[in-house]
A protein has these predicted regions:
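Ankyrin-repeat intra-repeat helix-capping/turn positions
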Residues: 85, 119, 152, 185-186, ...
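Intrinsically disordered, low-complexity regulatory regions that flank or link repeat-based scaffolds
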Residues: 1-72, 230-239
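Conserved ankyrin/ankyrin-like repeat signature
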Residues: 89, 122-123, 155-156, 189-190, ...
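Ankyrin repeat domain, specifically the short helix-to-loop turn at the C-terminus of the second helix
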Residues: 94-99, 125-132, 158-165, 192-200, ...
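Ankyrin repeat start-site detector
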Residues: 73, 106-107, 139-140, 172-173, ...
Length: 239
């Protein structure tokens, strides 16, 4: 299943939320005060329990069955295998030249995009080693780096940057990887990775005329990380 895309004008409703410190522990409060949890308390961990349970139920036999169903469509199988972390299947398809490493789905996502947004570093490494295009863009202009940064897959993002990914690439909505990380409440590691990069251009604006810092102030508890680049002159060489 493909990850949900970000809408450029999407803004969370923070009017009724209550801010708590990073150290706030709901479980500890539950132990000491029973059911008296303050209204508006929000967990910093975002997850889908139904999806997690579904994933736990899928064993190797299920995956092999899915692969068998797609065997006559190796391109579809490669895209699926990259997303599902089926490294051996990815390696087999590429070694047999059964599918092209930069094959695309209907939204122009490549196997590298899918592995990047799913956080599968070993698959990402294999795809790049086999010639995957780190600059490939989807119909909305997303690169694999955008996909990794949106979902806080920091190790994947770091690997892509080491292999010439454009840290300032902009989508059709003018979103950079930094914009996407800034809108994610769980993105501290990825924000630090991007902001510490000498080539970052934090002043870039999306089509709503917002910088990544603007988005972070509105949506993230880690907006203070942008102090890393405040008042600094970009040291990247002219293009």
């Amino acid at each position: 299943m493909e990850k949900e895309k970000v809408k450029d004008d999407e803004k969370p409703d923070l009017g009724n939320s209550v801010d708590f410190s990073e150290q706030f522990n709901q479980l500890e409060l539950l132990k000491t005060h029973g059911h008296l949890i303050p209204t508006g308390t929000q967990s910093l961990w975002v997850g889908n329990s139904d999806e997690d349970e579904e994933q736990e139920e899928k064993n190797e036999e299920w995956y092999l069955l899915q692969e068998k169903k797609m065997e006559k469509d190796p391109s579809k199988l490669l895209l699926w295998a990259a997303e599902k972390n089926r490294l051996a299947t990815v390696q087999r398809l590429l070694s047999e030249k059964a599918a092209e490493v930069n094959t695309r789905d209907e939204d122009e996502y490549t196997p590298l995009h899918r592995a990047a947004y799913s956080g599968h570093l070993d698959v990402v490494r294999e795809l790049v080693a086999q010639g995957a295009d780190v600059h490939a863009v989807t119909v909305d202009g997303w690169t694999p780096l955008h996909s990794a940064c949106k979902w806080n897959n920091t190790r994947v993002a770091s690997f892509l940057l080491q292999h010439d990914a454009d840290i300032n690439a902009q989508t059709k909505g003018l979103l950079t990887p930094l914009h996407l990380a800034a809108g994610n409440r769980d993105s501290r590691d990825t924000l630090e990775l991007l902001l510490m990069n000498r080539y970052i251009k934090p002043e870039l604006k999306n089509n709503s005329q917002e910088t990544a810092s603007d988005i972070a102030r509105r949506t993230s508890i880690y907006h203070y990380l942008f102090e890393i680049v405040e008042g600094c002159t970009n040291s990247s060489p002219p293009s």
